[in-house]
């Protein structure tokens, strides 16, 4: 686990950032360059609202989506930390495709109200502090498809305009602090003649330019004065920053305030590469001989030239250098990168996925963790890097709170209240240890799966356990049901009948096919103390002790927890979906691409991606792999 040693950076404070609200500093009447000139430096809330869980219904509790990739739920305190650290811009990557449904009455796609309200809440945390906020559509399965065709364009247009029509209505009166980004990194994921991460080709450029125009027309057509002057960001092919890609972006006629959106984790062999050509010293050269300073100089000179030619600003929506335990080099890189960007008039938005350097795991090209979200403090290896960034862009008032490890509250039966009408299915006073993703059967659990009951699990772990239904029909047979956020409290997770039915419906299965039910550790180890069937109309226990003991399920056999009996297959290196005999962040990225339908797997890859051996690949496998690779600090 990461711990704060003596060398941890102390709080860096150059004053207290001024607190103010957007209402007190309304921004209006600016042109595109006027807006971007005020965007000093930004921060991405990465792998949070852009995470997805395709096993959930479109109107599921948002927390289940935003925590699906292993990050804690975002909080206002996190955004406060970002603001106080000197950032005046927040980009909120947001995935929508799992939260929309087709409305036959209007022949349009609609966004779930619960998701839209959640997105608005997060936007407001930053907007109400006078920060610039970039809201986008991110990992969309209708944008990133194998091959761009007329049919895929028709689908993409219908869904994209449906989403943005509603977003523009909800935020119609927000001033120029709120910026809309039409798409994230639009690209073809399975076209052998057009590389997914290359420059693109004429067909893909035309395709993306049409979608960009559809986006602009949708926002401008909403009608509010604010949306008429809102800054809109337009990406090229995969939001690449190459001269060919950016030059191919067409600015729609009469589009008003627009900016080009680019991403550049450069120089690549310093910032992300882990192969033999990587060199994580700065300044320096790659294994191919390319000079890092020269590469950055060329990049920003080229972007400045294109910006001048097209007459629109450019925003670097994502940039970062992965943490290879090379803090001083990253600090020098940050100064070089941002000084050149500043000279070119390009504001930059730092990518932060909350993944820190892990000495046990070694080099990781996706360790872009700057703010530790469990305690809203700065990762030790990133404090000097952030200080270099702020100093370079001219921010003088900022506070970087010293790293503090998360300490989970201690479990005690004294802090758990059991209702007098709860039916005890299992109890272990000392707790049953379950390893991550370990399901174990609880006798008599299935008996209470009805509208008359819900389940309560008393547990102790950072990540709440799940309840698993095993069936012999449908698409798989093992279905994880996550806790009900509206009912659960510390140390007690609740699972309702509707939660189970929603999971079964999404997998084309039914309750009649259930053979057994299990309690399971989720994406981290867990200790299970009790499992209870709770009457649906049961009152939440008060702080007073129950006057009677909970009902114990009568049985002729002792209440036991037993191992599942499914045979396992031949041993493979679980998680190695890249088939390179190692398990790294590259495997996490590839698995995520599979889940958003931008990658296909061979049988061997499928077997290795099936982390919990349930013959299915879903978000639970992605979370398990991600935890294994880089997010196990809090469990150790």
Question: Where do the model's predicted regions map?
Answer:
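Acidic/histidine-rich helix-loop elements
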Residues: 46-74, 103-111, 152, 269-295
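Cellulosome-associated attachment modules in secreted, modular CAZymes
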Residues: 7-18, 540-636
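N-terminal carbohydrate-binding accessory modules
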Residues: 19-89
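Extracellular ligand-binding interfaces
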Residues: 411-513, 520-536
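An active-site-proximal structural segment forming one wall of the substrate-binding cleft
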Residues: 70-89, 100, 106-139, 146-182, ...
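Aromatic-rich peripheral "rim/lid" segments of glycoside hydrolase catalytic domains that contact
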Residues: 326-409
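Surface-exposed, active-site-proximal loop segments in enzymatic domains
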Residues: 54-63, 96-117, 141-156, 188-200, ...
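Active-site region of glycoside hydrolase catalytic domains
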Residues: 158-289, 301-321, 343-344
């Amino acid at each position: 686990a990461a711990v704060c040693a003596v060398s941890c950076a102390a709080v860096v404070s150059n004053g207290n950032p001024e607190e103010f609200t957007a209402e007190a500093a309304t921004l209006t009447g600016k042109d595109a360059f006027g807006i971007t000139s005020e965007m000093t430096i930004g921060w991405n809330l990465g792998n949070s609202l852009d995470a997805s869980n395709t096993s959930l219904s479109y109107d599921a509790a948002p927390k289940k989506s935003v925590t699906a990739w292993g990050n804690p739920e975002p909080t206002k305190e996190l955004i406060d930390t970002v603001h106080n650290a000197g950032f005046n811009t927040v980009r909120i990557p947001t995935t929508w495709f799992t939260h929309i449904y087709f409305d036959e009455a209007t022949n349009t796609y609609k966004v779930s109200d619960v998701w839209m309200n959640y997105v608005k809440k997060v936007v407001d945390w930053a907007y109400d502090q006078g920060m610039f906020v970039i809201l986008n559509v991110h990992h969309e399965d209708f944008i990133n498809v194998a091959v761009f065709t007329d049919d895929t364009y028709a689908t993409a247009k219908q869904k994209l305009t449906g989403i943005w029509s509603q977003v523009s209505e909800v935020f119609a009166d927000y001033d120029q602090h709120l910026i809309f980004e039409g798409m994230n990194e639009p690209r073809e994921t399975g076209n052998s003649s057009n590389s997914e991460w290359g420059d693109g080709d004429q067909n893909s450029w035309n395709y993306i330019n049409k979608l960009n125009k559809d986006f602009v027309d949708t926002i401008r057509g909403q009608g509010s004065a604010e949306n008429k002057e809102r800054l809109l960001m337009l990406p090229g092919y995969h939001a690449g920053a190459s001269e060919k890609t950016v030059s191919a972006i067409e600015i729609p006629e009469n589009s008003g305030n627009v900016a080009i959106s680019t991403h550049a984790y450069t120089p690549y062999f310093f910032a992300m590469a882990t192969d033999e050509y990587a060199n994580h010293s700065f300044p320096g050269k790659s294994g191919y001989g390319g000079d890092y300073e020269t590469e950055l100089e060329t990049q920003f000179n080229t972007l400045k030239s294109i910006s001048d030619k097209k007459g629109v600003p450019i925003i670097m929506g994502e940039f970062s250098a992965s943490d290879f335990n090379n803090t001083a080099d990253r600090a020098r890189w940050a100064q070089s990168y941002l000084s050149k960007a500043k000279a070119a008039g390009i504001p930059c938005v730092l990518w932060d996925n909350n993944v820190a350097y892990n000495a046990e795991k070694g080099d990781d090209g996706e360790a872009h963790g700057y703010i530790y979200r469990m305690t809203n403090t700065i990762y030790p290896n990133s404090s000097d890097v952030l200080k270099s960034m702020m100093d370079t862009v001219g921010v003088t008032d900022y506070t970087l709170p010293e790293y503090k490890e998360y300490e989970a509250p201690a479990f005690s039966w004294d802090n758990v209240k059991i209702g007098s009408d709860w039916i005890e299915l299992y109890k272990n006073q000392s707790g049953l240890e379950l390893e991550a993703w370990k399901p174990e059967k609880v006798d008599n659990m299935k008996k209470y799966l009805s509208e008359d009951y819900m389940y309560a699990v008393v547990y102790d772990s950072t990540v709440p356990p799940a309840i698993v239904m095993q069936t012999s029909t449908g698409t798989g047979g093992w279905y994880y049901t996550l806790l009900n956020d509206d009912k659960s409290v510390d140390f007690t997770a609740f699972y309702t009948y509707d939660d189970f039915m929603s999971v079964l419906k999404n997998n084309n299965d039914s309750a009649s096919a259930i053979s057994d039910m299990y309690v399971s550790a989720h994406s981290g180890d867990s200790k299970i103390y009790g499992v209870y069937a709770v009457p649906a109309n049961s009152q939440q226990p008060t702080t007073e002790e129950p006057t009677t003991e909970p009902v114990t399920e009568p049985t002729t056999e002792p209440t036991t927890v037993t191992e599942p009996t499914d045979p396992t297959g031949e041993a493979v290196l679980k998680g190695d979906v890249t088939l390179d005999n190692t398990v790294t962040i590259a495997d996490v990225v590839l698995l995520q691409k599979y889940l958003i339908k931008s990658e296909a797997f061979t049988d061997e890859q499928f077997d290795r991606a099936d982390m919990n051996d349930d013959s299915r690949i879903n978000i639970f496998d992605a979370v398990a792999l991600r935890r294994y690779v880089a997010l196990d600090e809090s469990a150790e």
